Amino acid sequence: MIKITVKRFNGEKEYLESYEVPENITVLEALEYINKHYEANILFRASCRNAQCGSCAVTINGEPRLACETKVEDGMIIEPLRGFKVIRDLIVDREPYYKKLLGIKNYLIRKNYPEELEILIPKYVEENKELRGCIDCLSCLSVCPAREVSDYPGPTFMRQLARFAFDKRDEDGREITAYFENIYNCTTCAKCVEVCPKEIDIVHRAIEKLRALAFSKGYYIENHLKVRENVLKYNRSVVEEELPLLKQVADFYPAESEKLRVAFFTGCLVDFRLQNVGKDAIKVLNAHGVSVVIPKNQVCCGSPFFRTGQRDVAEMLKRKNLEIFNKLDVDCVVTICAGCGSTLKNDYKERKFEVKDITEVLTEVGLLKYKPLKMRITYHDPCHLRRGQKIYKQPREILKSIPELEFIDIEARCCGAGGGVRSGKPDIANLIGKSRARMIYDANVDAVITVCPFCEYHIRDSLKRFKEENKIDKEIDVMNIVSLLAKVI
């Protein structure tokens, strides 16, 4: 027997109850066992028992899961889905969801009915097949950071709109509805994709495609055009403030005993804002036996434009970088920006080179014996690294290898900067950032480490605002993992 805990609600107060249940059964079976053997009368929803109806979704150890397909574990905590009004025990109020579905017209709309029988081409049906796989479990809504702080309805609503927007029979302008339903509030953190039991890629298959369609029809965020102007003028998404990194460094930095030769993709912020981070990266790579080639004519990866629907600029930048990096004789291209790495890996389909995050490279060539560093730190998982590239073990392996460094792990949560939200919807970005800042301060650390210049900037700003608003004396530093390593090699 093992022990699990269930969060109860009797209509007036919440409380926790623990029960012993058999091993090797599902959470749904455990709840039924508890009601039968303990007469607990826990209320919950369930129907198909086969992961098809979505009704049994609950929060398990902090993550939304289907009770019918999740095995019980000792110490497991079961709660109702977060982000919804709780009616009783594990039952949440789904009524607002269904009303909103009707509000966005989740049905095929024809304005001009065909006179003859239409033949659906299999290719078009297949394109939308993934979007039709939703089982309405509402897991994605329960974890969406934008929905939590704004009137953005959430991922599954955008999936519904995309489902019809890309159906050639529908004639309702779903991209316009998406625009007015605040599709640009989405940070593209892909937490919705991570928790979806049907593995629907809502970010790439729905959000970004709807944004591209909306942009083509003139529905966009005005501030995103400023970023567009920057890249068309400077080949960077930000304006130059001091001498760029690419004008400060050499073309090649050889390692003494070369284990690997890489091309360094700097990204916009490291080139134009965080030049010292770029220099630290070169120093750290060389110290680990990695020679560094630095192409001076590289440009923005295009991530801000892929994410915000500006496909024309994104494709133009991609072509430029492919022409540069496809010619290089290196083992791989290394990035120190989560957004750049995710874009190169996932959007550069025509590339002839392998892309690796710097933490991948360092753990593969072998970590050094680092100098001790007395510091209490936590790590922020950039969304485009953890979910965009499936990299989360390597940074932790590096941090845990530094002697005397006290590492406090916290929940992986979006900082609010991505998906064009920091530039286009700063108020939304700040609200999400405030939540992240609170978690970091609650960890009582000296510094937060990350592997994304964009996260670094936004978390630093969020911590500063949180400190001032709450009159906190403690200062928490924010740094890229390469800058931390530069201190201990």
UniProtKB/Swiss-Prot annotation:
Binding site for [4Fe-4S] cluster 1: 134, 137, 140, 196
KW Iron (keyword) present: yes
MF annotations from Gene Ontology: 2 iron, 2 sulfur cluster binding; 4 iron, 4 sulfur cluster binding; electron transfer activity; metal ion binding; oxidoreductase activity
Taxonomic superkingdom: Archaea
Record has 4Fe-4S as a keyword: yes
SUPFAM superfamilies: 2Fe-2S ferredoxin-like, alpha-helical ferredoxin
InterPro entries for this protein: 2Fe-2S_ferredoxin-like_sf, 2Fe-2S_ferredoxin-type, 2Fe2S_fd_BS, 4Fe4S_Fe-S-bd, 4Fe4S_Fe_S_CS, Beta-grasp_dom_sf, Cys_rich_dom, Helical_ferredxn
GO process annotations (BP): tricarboxylic acid cycle
UniProt keyword terms in alphabetical order: 2Fe-2S, 4Fe-4S, Iron, Iron-sulfur, Metal-binding, Repeat
Gene Ontology CC: plasma membrane
PROSITE patterns associated with the record: 2FE2S_FER_1 (PS00197), 2FE2S_FER_2 (PS51085), 4FE4S_FER_1 (PS00198), 4FE4S_FER_2 (PS51379)
Residue ranges annotated for the 2Fe-2S ferredoxin-type domain, each copy included: 2-84
Residue positions binding [4Fe-4S] cluster 2: 144, 186, 189, 192
Protein name (Swiss-Prot/TrEMBL): Uncharacterized iron-sulfur protein MJ0092
Natural source organism: Methanocaldococcus jannaschii (strain ATCC 43067 / DSM 2661 / JAL-1 / JCM 10045 / NBRC 100440)
